Amino acid sequence: MNSRIPEDLIERAHRGKTTKEDALLLLEVPPFELFRFADELRDLAAGDTVTYVVNRNINFTSRCTGSCGFCAFRTDDGKVLSIEEIMEKVREAEKANATEVCIQGGLLPDVGLDFYQGIVEAIKAEFPEMHVHSFSPMEVYHASRISEIPVKESLRRLKRSGLDTMPGTAAEILSDRVRKIICPAKLNTAEWIEVVTQAHAAGIPTTATMMYGHVETPEERINHMLTIREIQKETGGITEFVPLPFMPYNNPVGEKMIKEGRYATPGLEDLKVYAVSRILFHGHVDNIQASWVKLGKKFAQFSLHCGVNDLGGTLMEESISRSAGACHGEMITVDELEWMIHGAGRIPKERTTLYREAHELASRNSRKIAGCGAFE
């Protein structure tokens, strides 16, 4: 069969040198040819193993001084969990054999770095082996301003307190044109890059995300990925790339889209994003993650044939996507995740946050994560 993908593009991709022009051309290739190429590169980078992490999300407050137009989670007067309330959720996670807690929340007007350090220190004092994967670049930037200390120093202090890794959220699209429309009060592109690269310098690896499907252009998506790739070439501190389709419900940006006759990204477009991500990041970021909360379980399963090699976590609770209209649940058992992976013809493997093999695991089909009711 004649390929619509030029040979020189294929050769550049294998060397980790896919260009912006290459990526834009790939978006025009017949979808299943694109998926096949991405799947070949996935096999080279990760083999037939599909990973997941047993974790728990903890959103400590919906109260936020921010004004992001895409957010359906923020409130003006939401409850702020105390450290003891956060710890109770961590204890429940530990009982459910979680290896990671991911803690994030809204931006509080008078809460500086001490609050964030206190959370980490409380967790590490009681559960020194629990991996703390917490606080977005925006939270760190905001806390630094409140505490009147440089971001670099904030990250050093968080590292000393025991912060292991950070989620590379708050990235949205790394284009100031886009950010001025959807999140004008949020840190700009250069500031996001500064927080992430300073985190890596402090010994705190991060993930990297991209929230797409709102006001950005295809070229801005590609530029976003190339920016992440350049960071990775400089620091090597990014563990995974996570494309996140925008949920256009219950938020101003989405309401405007719907009035204009535009809705959530079509599924085929989502799969193209995952495939192009795999190709652009080949040789740089080995792990491409699909969010089953955003895509749905069956579609996330199909993404495993489009370049994806990781399905994220069990979560146990997920408030942010759900508030914006995601309807695919907020927890999943290890049994079901492994069933999905086997059903896609792949080999499931529990991992740590840093993509190392989790202790005492080959396949824990006998061990289940408690349902949501156990955490209410």
From Swiss-Prot:
Q: Which SUPFAM superfamilies match?
A: Radical SAM enzymes (SSF102114)
The protein depicted here goes by the name 5-amino-6-(D-ribitylamino)uracil--L-tyrosine 4-hydroxyphenyl transferase 1
Which pathway does the UniProt entry assign to this protein?
A: Cofactor biosynthesis; coenzyme F0 biosynthesis
Q: Which PANTHER family match?
A: FO SYNTHASE (COFH), LIPOYL SYNTHASE 2
For this protein, what is the EC number? 2.5.1.147
Pfam families documented for this protein: CofH_C, Radical_SAM
Per the entry, the cofactor note is: Binds 1 [4Fe-4S] cluster. The cluster is coordinated with 3 cysteines and an exchangeable S-adenosyl-L-methionine.
Q: Which PROSITE patterns match?
A: RADICAL_SAM
- Which NCBIfam families does the record match to this protein? CofH family radical SAM protein, F420_cofH, PRK07360.1
Q: Which cofactor does it need?
A: [4Fe-4S] cluster
Instruction: Give the originating organism.
Output: Methanosarcina mazei (strain ATCC BAA-159 / DSM 3647 / Goe1 / Go1 / JCM 11833 / OCM 88)
The entry sums up its family as follows: Belongs to the radical SAM superfamily. CofH family.
What this chain does, per the entry, is described as: Catalyzes the radical-mediated synthesis of 5-amino-5-(4-hydroxybenzyl)-6-(D-ribitylimino)-5,6-dihydrouracil from 5-amino-6-(D-ribitylamino)uracil and L-tyrosine.
> Which UniProt keywords are listed?
4Fe-4S, Iron, Iron-sulfur, Metal-binding, S-adenosyl-L-methionine, Transferase
Give me the reactions it catalyses: 5-amino-6-(D-ribitylamino)uracil + L-tyrosine + S-adenosyl-L-methionine = 5-amino-5-(4-hydroxybenzyl)-6-(D-ribitylimino)-5,6-dihydrouracil + 2-iminoacetate + 5'-deoxyadenosine + L-methionine + H(+)
Q: Does the keyword Cell cycle apply?
A: no
Share what the entry says about its subunit structure, partners included.
Consists of two subunits, CofG and CofH.
Q: Which residues form the Radical SAM core domain?
A: 50-275
Task: Give the residues the record marks as binding [4Fe-4S] cluster.
Answer: 64, 68, 71
Recorded superkingdom:
Archaea
Example GO molecular function = iron ion binding
